[in-house]
């Protein structure tokens, strides 16, 4: 069976130049040496100068727009990754979607693993802003999937209705969703579904292709928060991730629907552990156990996940680099949510608030989706513990307000150096 490096070379002729870097560096998950990536990086010829092509970002509120200057654009606009992915393709979703006045989005995506190296002059400062000061040029990311290290992890179920942990993983050697061809997307599905067939015990389940579901079946899974929504988000469509929908997309879940894998949405895969109630410790234990098993099954079939020591696990959006992890709860906070200090409390705890149905949805019956804001620079264990401690603080605030007592804004958490 061909190894991942030979698969990578056969899938991408332009990467044959990288063979000089040595297959071992890829197989071990070590970042490709910049000089090797540059050797395989292409240049494209333009009819007009960069100044004529520079996008109008004056009214934009996203990280890309904050860091893309005319000079940076001029230096990067003619470069391509070994698969032909360009700077303009990276930023198009941020150009087309200026952002929310109060929510600063990332505004750019990667088309392949090499994107983060070829266009590092723009991606690195965006990553640093989005990830609370994490500098990918000088810092290293830590992975820790030892669920036994979690303290507490049992929420008061009068407040917490459900608990969930998710991450994303990308198959090395295949383009990411914004850039992948139909054949690559189908190959992702084949590789992942074949590996998942090896899951046993409480993780055993089956795969459901979207193309084989009825509209009613799809909608029921969406309403039950098991399946990703249809690709109507302008962030997805502008980035090219809705192409050929629903070809090679689907959901795999175990028999209890407590361990799920999304295939070919925003990322090659999204791995999810979830259940009703407040037992976050059990949810995380299942997540770690299942994720380790999935990675082992992928590797046994001659493939591996995209990873390097600076950026952790490589995913489509820079916001999900590192762990790719979002640990969240649906929590009822009728009093705290109306307190003017609520946003600052969340900010200092490095927590993120979404509506009951996720991004860009309202809170129903004062139920919010609360999760970790950071993904990179802290391990999975650290982030889940941060959510446990932070949500318990929010619940304590809610209890105090119920009793007519005052609450306080906690001091901001400091980003650790790695």
Curated annotation (Swiss-Prot):
One protein family per Pfam: ATP-gua_Ptrans
Domain of life of the source: Eukaryota
Phosphothreonine sites (modified residues): 214, 356
Tissue: In many tissues, with highest levels in brain gut and kidney. In the kidney localized primarily in the outer medulla in the thick ascending limb and distal convoluted tubule.
Principal place of residence: mitochondrion
GO molecular function, one term: ATP binding
Chain segments carrying region Cardiolipin-binding: 40-64
Membrane topology according to the record: Peripheral membrane protein
Coiled-coil residues: none
Catalytic activity: creatine + ATP = N-phosphocreatine + ADP + H(+)
More about this protein: Mitochondrial creatine kinase binds cardiolipin.
Name used for this protein in its record: Creatine kinase U-type, mitochondrial
Organism: Rattus norvegicus (Rat)
The gene coding this protein: Ckmt1
């Amino acid at each position: 069976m061909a190894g991942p490096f030979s698969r990578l070379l056969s899938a991408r002729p332009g990467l044959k130049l990288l063979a000089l870097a040595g297959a071992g560096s890829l197989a071990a998950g070590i970042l490709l040496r910049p000089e090797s990536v540059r050797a395989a990086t292409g240049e494209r010829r333009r009819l007009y100068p960069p100044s004529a092509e520079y996008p109008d970002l004056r009214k934009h509120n996203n990280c890309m727009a904050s860091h893309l200057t005319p000079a940076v654009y001029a230096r990067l606009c003619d470069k391509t990754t070994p698969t032909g992915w360009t700077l303009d393709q990276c930023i198009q979703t941020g150009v087309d979607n200026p952002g929310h006045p109060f929510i600063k989005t990332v505004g750019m995506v990667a088309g392949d693993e090499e994107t983060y190296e070829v266009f590092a002059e723009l991606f690195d400062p965006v990553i640093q802003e989005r990830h609370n000061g994490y500098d990918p040029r000088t810092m290293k990311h830590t992975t820790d999937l030892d669920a036994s290290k979690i303290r507490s992890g049992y929420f008061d179920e009068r407040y917490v209705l459900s608990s969930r942990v998710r991450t994303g993983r990308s198959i090395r050697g295949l383009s990411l969703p914004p850039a992948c061809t139909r054949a690559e997307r189908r190959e992702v599905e084949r590789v992942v579904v074949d590996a998942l067939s090896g899951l046993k015990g409480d993780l055993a389940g089956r795969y459901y292709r979207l193309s084989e579901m009825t509209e009613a079946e799809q909608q029921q899974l969406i309403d039950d928060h098991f399946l990703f929504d249809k690709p109507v988000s302008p962030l997805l469509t502008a980035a090219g991730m809705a192409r050929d929908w629903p070809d090679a997309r689907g959901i795999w879940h175990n028999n209890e629907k407590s361990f799920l894998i999304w295939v070919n949405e925003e990322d090659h895969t999204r791995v999810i552990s979830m259940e009703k109630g407040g037992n976050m410790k059990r949810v995380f234990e299942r997540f770690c156990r299942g994720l380790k098993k999935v990675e082992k099954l992928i590797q046994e079939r001659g493939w591996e996940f995209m990873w390097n020591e600076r950026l952790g696990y490589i995913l489509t959006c820079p916001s999900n680099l590192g762990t790719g992890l979002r640990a969240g709860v649906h929590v009822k906070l009728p009093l705290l949510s109306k307190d003017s200090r609520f946003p600052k409390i969340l900010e200092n705890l490095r927590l993120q608030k979404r509506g009951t149905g996720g991004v860009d949805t309202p809170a129903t019956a004062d139920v919010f989706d609360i999760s970790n804001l950071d993904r990179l620079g802290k391990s999975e264990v650290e982030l889940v513990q941060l959510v446990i401690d932070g949500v318990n603080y929010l619940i304590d605030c809610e209890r105090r307000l119920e009793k007519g007592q005052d609450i306080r804004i906690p001091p901001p958490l400091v980003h650790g150096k790695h």
